[in-house]
């Protein structure tokens, strides 16, 4: 499997409104400059750069491009100020009940440990080099299917963490980068404002090391989990891309014969 084929597969097996986004960190200036994608000439929040990439835009970013202080902190392009680190900053805005809880949020977030010289944010299908992180923002049904694809090879996902804050920058990017594992987010009010996500959209971050097996897992779990209506769409999208659709089996699901109904006899 390669990147282009994996995108063809995932966009066939899932009915995505947005294309998967690849994130690559550069820690060498020469490598960053040689990466043939134009650097954005304006400020942008990191989360909105992901949103733009999900609609086909490709860009490189440096610390000068960062339009959100919290996103820049997660990416280690800005130092974490003391009021944020000690919990007083968020407590002052009544985000958390007390200083202990507020500080625990800062303590438990996983930011980059080394500052990158730059970041590439673009549609996954555009990459020739391997990105570090893949982000999919979609409806809960599609994120469920990605989780099921992950579970096919990995079992239970035990370390999902989110708190409705720093959703794209920390939940989906730096937390995933540090743990080398998937994570989900329900997004946060900030990114929903500046990136204008739809109300029903949530996200999942995937380390590239797990990407191909997740795509394969989504494919393998299609017949047990997808209903006939969804299978019709999958079959159509596969054929439109010239991909093999012969493995799609209708009238077959994991829960066949499991449910019962009808009138019951009551006592008395």
Could you say what each language-model-derived stretch is?
Residues 3-268:
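Acidic, serine/proline-rich low-complexity intrinsically disordered regions
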